[in-house]
């Protein structure tokens, strides 16, 4: 076959009688599309047969979930990589307007993964879908839509229901021939005259299979490998099982075409367990960090490049936030994400690799396995490093209490000691200033208490009781030096490297997330636990286990509010803490606190004592242990009230009206109060 360019399907080229027609060096360049499928035998046959000068693979979804290393086939050389957000920013795709719409509640039942078929094709649901498709519309002279369903019978029944109401649609699945699919695509893209409602004017002499289509209903096809530029409306009637598949289905409408300014994406969201995958897919955020995912639901359009928009209705937001709260990091998911990075870079990844590549948040490995190397040892047979029990304890201490980057002081101290330096207070101050931090003796002393484990309490104190990082003898003289035991451990090169990687990762987190802090060492709207607040506000000891709603100590009064309280808590703790507006917050003390109580008087007379009152809020206990930092507050008015305990007895309680230093940002305010 004497041609310069040869195009072939994999199925054809992999046939023995065709493949053997070509010598191994017949082609200078071989380009394989849909390369993520290259783990299949037919692809292997082709790749192993030829020896081109250039083998190039192209795919929109390189991440496989079956453990096959696609990158290895190409020597781990990534020529170019562009994600959805990059393509939108570079104007390579058609802008989209995404609307997350609550699916219908039928007979008191929400649509979910287990919903019976009779509800999926219910007349009420059909009317709801049609009403929304007509309301949100499309760009162009008529609708040309793809509708993704969860089941074949659902697709067929909905197609019949649409046709009964005057639409022209077909249902397709993997059971249908390629010819039937191509014919349907041609009919969907067909240009024709339309009436005032944008509906095709069908001439009586045109046979049905030549008439233009309004919609194609599909189940397990059209996710990939099909190009229909004219699609101007994509409707999703199925749960999101994978962020990859979501983007593939979204992408069916993102091709540019004449007379198409944008594509409308309608996502009918039921009570699905995987709803958290929707913001992950739309944002392209691969960290699986819950706060990042929540932020995208709150601020989606603001974070998208170009003129694309994202909107969730209020019921849908609630469903997605609830799904995010339930989101768990399983061993399977963590292993999958770990292996994807390992395959991508062609070696055992360090903790820094995940952060630099914008992949899964490395703190999830630590939360799951206590240390990153513990996780590696469990899931990666190529990882053969083994540390002693004491070394593991030190790594666990650094991983759980220091590397989150919420303060650089401990990271810097350890790094200086790792480099062999004894740390004098003046040399530490210079290093601190070099990274843009002001030196404060209180912060320095607090960091020393953490490093010497004086700050640590409770379960942490028991867990790390055998660790000694600092020489106690030198500590008394004001000099920080490595203890003999720690120095001995650092002779292990692998151990030293592991600590160095952890510290570098911690400093990256600090610079990206926490460097822009206020004088309280806290970032406005950053997330902090009670333990974090004890440390960052320079308390002598971790008193988080007994802090509860608030505590006045060391000239500070951190207040922690759970905005949506559980129904099963005692009557005397059902405080009605709430925003009056974005600048004003109504807060109740614990019960049995009267106006003449010492706590009340300290808050009332905050100016005289210099008491700093700082407010932290989380929406519900489903968010975990961390609270949003809302900044400093000052009392503007107060009143003694009463609250009943479980026995009906009236107890005194103080109601303070606080003015916030910073008016609450709109998206945070809406999230907390709605």
Locations of regions flagged by a protein language model:
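Conserved helix/coil segment N-terminal to the catalytic DExD/H
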Residues: 1-29, 40-45
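Conserved helicase ATPase core of P-loop NTP-dependent helicases/translocases
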Residues: 18, 157, 167-222
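Post-DEXD/H (motif II) to motif III coupling segment of the RecA-like Helicase ATP-binding lobe
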Residues: 37-97
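Conserved interdomain linker/interface between the two RecA-like ATPase lobes of SF2 helicase motors
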Residues: 78-149
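Long, largely alpha-helical accessory region at the distal end of helicase-like NTP-driven motors
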Residues: 140, 145, 151, 282-415, ...
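Conserved segment of the helicase C-terminal RecA-like domain
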Residues: 243-248, 252-282
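Acidic, glycine-rich low-complexity segments with interspersed aromatic residues
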Residues: 380, 391-401, 407-413, 519-626
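Compact mixed alphabeta submodule
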Residues: 622-674
């Amino acid at each position: 076959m004497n041609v310069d360019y040869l195009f072939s399907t994999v199925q054809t080229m992999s046939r023995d009688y065709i493949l053997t027609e070509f010598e191994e060096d017949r082609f200078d360049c071989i380009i394989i599309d849909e390369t993520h499928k290259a783990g299949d035998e037919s692809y292997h046959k082709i790749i192993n047969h030829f020896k081109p000068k250039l083998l190039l693979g192209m795919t929109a979804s390189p991440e496989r979930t079956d453990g096959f290393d696609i990158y290895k086939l190409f020597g781990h050389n990534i020529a170019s990589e562009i994600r959805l957000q990059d393509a939108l920013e570079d104007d390579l795709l058609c802008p989209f307007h995404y609307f997350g719409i609550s699916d219908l509640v039928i007979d008191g039942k929400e649509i979910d993964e287990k919903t019976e078929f009779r509800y999926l094709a219910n007349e009420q649901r059909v009317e709801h879908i049609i009403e929304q498709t007509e309301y949100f519309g499309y760009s162009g002279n008529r609708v040309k839509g793809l509708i993704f369903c969860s089941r074949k019978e659902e697709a067929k029944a909905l197609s019949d229901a649409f046709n009964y109401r005057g639409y022209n649609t077909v249902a397709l699945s993997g059971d249908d021939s390629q010819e039937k699919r191509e014919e349907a695509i041609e009919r969907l893209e067909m240009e024709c005259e339309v009436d005032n409602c944008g509906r095709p004017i069908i001439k009586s002499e045109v046979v049905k299979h030549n008439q233009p289509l309004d919609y194609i209903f599909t189940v397990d096809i059209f996710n990939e490998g099909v190009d229909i530029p004219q699609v101007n409306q994509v409707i999703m009637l199925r749960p999101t099982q994978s962020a990859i598949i979501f983007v593939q289905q979204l992408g069916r409408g993102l091709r540019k075409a004449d007379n198409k300014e944008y594509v409308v994406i309608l996502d009918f969201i039921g009570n699905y367990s995987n709803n958290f995958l929707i913001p992950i897919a739309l944002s392209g955020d691969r960290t699986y960090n819950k706060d990042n995912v929540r932020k995208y639901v709150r601020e989606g359009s603001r974070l998208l490049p170009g003129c694309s928009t994202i909107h969730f209705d209020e019921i849908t937001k609630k469903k997605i936030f609830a799904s995010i709260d339930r989101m768990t990091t399983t061993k399977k998911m963590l292993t999958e994400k770990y292996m994807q990075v390992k395959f991508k870079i062609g070696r055992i990844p360090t903790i820094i690799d995940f952060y630099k590549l914008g992949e899964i948040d490395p703190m999830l490995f630590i939360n799951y396995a206590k240390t990153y190397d513990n996780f590696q040892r469990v899931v990666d047979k190529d990882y053969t490093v083994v540390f002693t029990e004491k070394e593991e304890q030190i790594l666990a201490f650094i991983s759980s209490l220091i590397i989150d980057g919420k303060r650089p002081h401990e990271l810097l101290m350890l790094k200086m000691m790792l480099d062999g330096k004894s740390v004098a207070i003046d040399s530490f101050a210079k290093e601190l200033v070099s990274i843009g931090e002001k030196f404060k003796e209180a912060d320095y002393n607090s960091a020393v208490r953490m490093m010497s484990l004086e700050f640590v309490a409770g379960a942490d104190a028991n867990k790390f009781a055998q660790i000694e990082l600092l020489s106690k003898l030198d500590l008394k003289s004001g000099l920080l030096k490595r203890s003999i035991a720690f120095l001995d451990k650092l002779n292990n090169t692998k151990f030293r490297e592991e600590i160095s990687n952890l510290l570098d990762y911690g400093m990256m987190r600090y610079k990206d997330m926490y460097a822009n802090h206020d004088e309280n060492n806290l970032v406005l709207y950053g997330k902090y636990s009670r333990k974090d607040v004890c440390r960052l506000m320079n308390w002598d000891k971790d008193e988080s286990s007994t802090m509860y709603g608030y505590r006045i100590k060391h000239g500070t009064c951190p207040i922690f509010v759970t905005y949506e309280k559980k129904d099963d808590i005692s009557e005397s703790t059902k405080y009605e803490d709430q925003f009056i507006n974005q600048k004003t917050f109504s807060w109740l003390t614990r019960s049995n606190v009267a106006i003449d109580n010492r706590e009340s008087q300290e808050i009332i007379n905050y100016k005289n004592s210099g008491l700093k009152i700082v407010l932290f809020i989380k929406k519900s206990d489903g968010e975990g242990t961390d609270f949003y930092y809302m900044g400093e507050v000052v009392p503007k008015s107060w009143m003694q009230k009463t609250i009943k305990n479980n026995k009906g007895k009236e107890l005194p309680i103080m109601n303070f009206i606080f003015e916030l230093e910073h008016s609450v940002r709109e998206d945070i305010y809406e999230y907390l109060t709605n």
